[in-house]
Amino acid sequence: MLGLPPQSARMAHKIFLHQSFQQVAPGLWQLEGSLPFPLKRNMTVVKLSSGGLLIYSAVALTDAGFAELERLGKPEIIVVPQPFHVMDLAFYKQKYPQLKVLGPKQGEEFNGVRVEADVVAVLKDANVTASLAPGLK
């Protein structure tokens, strides 16, 4: 089991350099962000049938980055794929309190934010199959 990331990674968000959103398919965008060590972060945004957005593996954005995100739609759902992807979760939940938080296990708490539903169960109930789209990392 991988466990939680180091305490330093679970502290208040810090905005690192990031790209602009790149559209990889209709209703599907990706953004690459940096970290203070040689790994990259990839955030994926999906346009929902409601017109809102699903954010997968959130990256803290600059004000210009958030303006770009909000031009795509209103954030509705945030997916935490696993404990190493929680660095900016509390920041997003504070900025968008209406966000529904999906994660690996309902009831888990990451950085003070509770997972409201199991992402696999929600996708299954919605008859959604997850797969890696061409062009995504």
Give the role of each language-model region.
Residues 2-60, 114-137:
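Catalytic core of the metallo-beta-lactamase
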Residues 55, 61-104:
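Active-site metal-binding motif and surrounding structural segment of the metallo-beta-lactamase
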Residues 97-98, 111-116:
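An exposure/low-complexity boundary signal
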